[in-house]
UniProtKB/Swiss-Prot annotation:
Organism: Limosilactobacillus reuteri (strain DSM 20016)
Reaction(s) this enzyme catalyzes, per UniProt: (6R)-NADHX = (6S)-NADHX; (6R)-NADPHX = (6S)-NADPHX
Protein task: Catalyzes the epimerization of the S- and R-forms of NAD(P)HX, a damaged form of NAD(P)H that is a result of enzymatic or heat-dependent hydration. This is a prerequisite for the S-specific NAD(P)H-hydrate dehydratase to allow the repair of both epimers of NAD(P)HX.
Protein name: NAD(P)H-hydrate epimerase
Keywords: Isomerase, Metal-binding, NAD, NADP, Nucleotide-binding, Potassium
PROSITE patterns: YJEF_N
Enzyme class: isomerase
Similarity-based family: Belongs to the NnrE/AIBP family.
Length: 212
């Protein structure tokens, strides 16, 4: 266990070193991240698993979300993927996870109405990547999430919260729990970020290595 708290740039540096110098593939890190979130959901929120919706952006945080959806599906949970953003801009890892999800025939939609019946929502839109005000479909999705009574589990960071400052970038997901990877993030400990994050769980057994 470590009390280390990092910025977005530090975390990107550690990920880059792990992937490109040590040689651990990014998909391996993504799978470990997904397993950590799955375990937290299954162990902490078993009563909220009737209808789970994973809200996935087009980047690697969304790829984490799709992997989480697959793992929950395999565990017998009824899960739907709500895709937000442009799939043509999806990262390579995201595209790989999408192909696997299609193999398992996990339901997917772009209709925000699916959130209305959700008992648990996984927020996998931005992660540590947000650096500007949230607008458009992402803002609509965040506001729709916040208008539900569902348990909300954020992946790495609540979408819309700045990783370095804890500032809300226009609008942000109000999470019940945030599962953050490898190290705690500065933005989860200060300003609005500490309130929007809910209970913070640091999944530190990620295989990501710090090099300072």
């Amino acid at each position: 266990m470590t009390d280390k708290i990092v910025t977005a740039e530090e975390m990107r540096h550690y990920d880059f070193y792990t992937i490109n110098t040590i040689g651990i593939p990014s998909l391996v890190l993504m799978e470990r991240a997904a397993l950590a979130v799955r375990d937290e959901i299954l162990h902490a929120f078993p009563i909220a698993l009737k209808d789970v919706v994973v809200v996935a952006g087009s980047g690697n945080n969304g790829g984490d979300g799709i992997a989480i959806a697959r793992l929950l599906h395999i565990a017998g949970v009824h899960v739907t993927i709500l895709n937000i953003g442009n799939p043509q801009h999806a990262s390579a890892e995201h595209q790989t996870q999408e192909k696997i999800a299609q193999y398992y025939q996990i339901p997917e939609t772009s209709d925000l109405a699916v959130l209305n019946k959700a008992t648990l929502i996984v927020d996998a839109m931005f992660g540590i990547g947000i650096d500007r005000a949230v607008k458009g479909a992402y803002a609509d999705a965040i506001n729709a999430i916040n208008n539900t009574d569902a348990v909300v589990v954020a992946v790495d960071m609540p979408s819309g919260v700045n990783t370095d400052t804890g500032e809300v970038m226009g609008t942000a997901v109000r999470a019940t729990t945030t599962v953050t990877f490898a190290y705690n993030k500065v933005g989860l400990t200060k300003n609005d970020g500490k309130d929007y994050a809910g209970n913070v769980v640091v999944a530190n057994d990620m295989g990501t290595y710090a090099v300072d």
